[in-house]
Amino acid sequence: MSYPVFASNVPTAEGKCPTFADSRSAFVPTVSVIIPVRNRSEVIVRCLQSVAAQTYERVRLIVVDNGSTDDTRSRVADWMSANAGRFVETCLLDEPRSGANAARNRGLRAVTDGYVAFFDSDDEMSPDFLTQMLAALRKDAAAQWVLARTRMIFPDGTEQVRHGVPHPSAAHHLLSAQVSTQSFVAEANLLRAVGGWDETLTCWQDYELGFRLLRAAPRTAWCSSVFHRIYRTPDSITGASLSENAEGIVHVLRKLAEQVEKVPHFPPHTLDIQLNGGHFATPSSDFSPIAAGGFPKGAESSAQAVDGSPTVADSTSIAEHATAEQAQCRLALWLRVHIIAGQFRAEGASSTADALLSAVGALLRRVSWLDLVVARLLLAYSSQGGRGAWRFAALWTRLR
């Protein structure tokens, strides 16, 4: 395999990363791997080597130093200088604002094309990750992003594969937290369209981003393999218990409740997205994919429109679907909040549980009395240390 040669890992004057100088971009999309790092001198090279070992032929490695006070930045710079032109295109950026999300967004702003994968500086990427993920995307031309499962490694050496199902709904993600930082590859334009990472969050950032991605682009490709070595260390951001991060968790759930309760609306460009194979487009989109059968089930009649534009019937169908999806997400989040409140109580943080139920419950429209009973049962089960409550909640949400 031949690798492109590039002159420097220094960003351009516009703050963008340097691009490949060869002519393959039209045929092989670039995947930018964005890694935020702060004071990870002892593990960062291991992570970089795992990205360099990718079998995919067009990788751009973007490392964003987030104010390291040790020699992390110099180690990254030395590694990039030593490997320039050998493995992947590299770019080293700085983000003075604290927080991994600020660093991730800095990296995203530097990307001009292709796909993006995010990774953490203390983990190891599987060598065939990008090859398999892009292959899955090629099989589903209407999908803008692809999901897979990941493998977690605990301090005692035990391993656990994270939950994952093909093509999860936004409601399923609210209960299962399927979308995690290292589990997806997405079009850069899609990530920008949903607003990138929320820099106000201190935990569960991928949980919140995953929900926005699934609402904006519900059609996902699926890769059935299990990837990576994701190390769960004692200083993990989630801590030893949920209640240690209660304030941050409540903040995330409040944000999600606000998003769920937003009244669905469909400006012209959104209708284009829904009907044009799920891809983000402008109001002046070419609607030839629609004429080829790329519209929602039951909307075939719109192909007869004189100008190829979506019809009123299409708009009504989409609006009805969105309303049903909103109700499903509301129920899923309602149940998830009760499960987490039960976990808070199991940890002896009853006042925190009550505060969560009050803060988030007030933002969600009331569910049916039967759903309320189920939520109370899940709360009681979780407060006694019961595990796997989300699986029953997911089943109940589907049945409703």
Where are these regions (language model features)?
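Flexible helix-coil transition and linker loops at the boundaries of alpha-helical arrays
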Residues: 260-270, 320-328
